[in-house]
């Protein structure tokens, strides 16, 4: 079910205003990837990058083309493990997060 424009705009506004929410997007994206839900993980990272308007900076940090980063996180994108881990490292660093895997 596609998200409405109002919902997306609300999420984007919250990302800009709430550092904890930005961090949770990264954590939830990581959890989605670990649970083999690539589409959700890519969508969450894409939302994070778009809302923070940091895609150009992150691409530069990763030393990849901005267009390649957008493609990687697009619906047909298939990021390599190396690219994905590098992206998580940079995004979590920007938000001052330390990601770690736990078990329940």
Where are the regions a protein language model picked out?
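Short, charged recognition helix plus adjacent turn
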Residues: 9, 71, 97-104
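Short alpha-helical DNA-recognition segment
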Residues: 50-70
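Major-groove DNA-recognition helix of helix-turn-helix-type DNA-binding domains
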Residues: 76
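DNA major-groove recognition helix of helix-turn-helix/homeodomain DNA-binding modules
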Residues: 81-98
